[in-house]
């Protein structure tokens, strides 16, 4: 329930376009921020702005349309999406990954093992960066599909027995 006092505090602490941009302008000028911001309220974009460079050499300025690899920052989103599928009975944590991805070469690995880093899968960088790997286009970003194809083609050795121990490997979330 909004009262006069809470409405007053909301107006004081409500960030506006100018204050947000000034904050990031200052950080950028100090060399402390290089990236893209987007601030929205109730699905309404308040501000969207790029700061700094996408590439330092050559000096390609960032735009709001540049894409970034999120890396491990995407894991909570992936885990949440998987658990929503479980809640909707569209997926089971005990499902074999092989039944979900036909070309996946390991029958005993489950969705739950991928989520908890207990699949035993080695890090994809260990087998995809190998000079003997079928990944020929080393100058472009490898995709999740590329990793699955390589796993199918070379069947890399497992780092540990599936379900036995925790071994942090980004390969798990590539598959999810």
Label each residue range with its predicted role.
Residues 1-9:
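Acidic/histidine-rich, surface-exposed loop or edge segments in extracytoplasmic proteins
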Residues 2-3, 47-48, 139-142:
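Short acidic/polar alpha-helix capping motifs at helix-coil junctions
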Residues 9-68, 92-94, 149-158:
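Short, conserved catalytic-motif segment at the N-terminal edge
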Residues 45, 121-122, 173:
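Solvent-exposed loop/turn segments at secondary-structure junctions
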Residues 56-169:
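Active-site-proximal loop and beta-strand segments within enzyme catalytic domains
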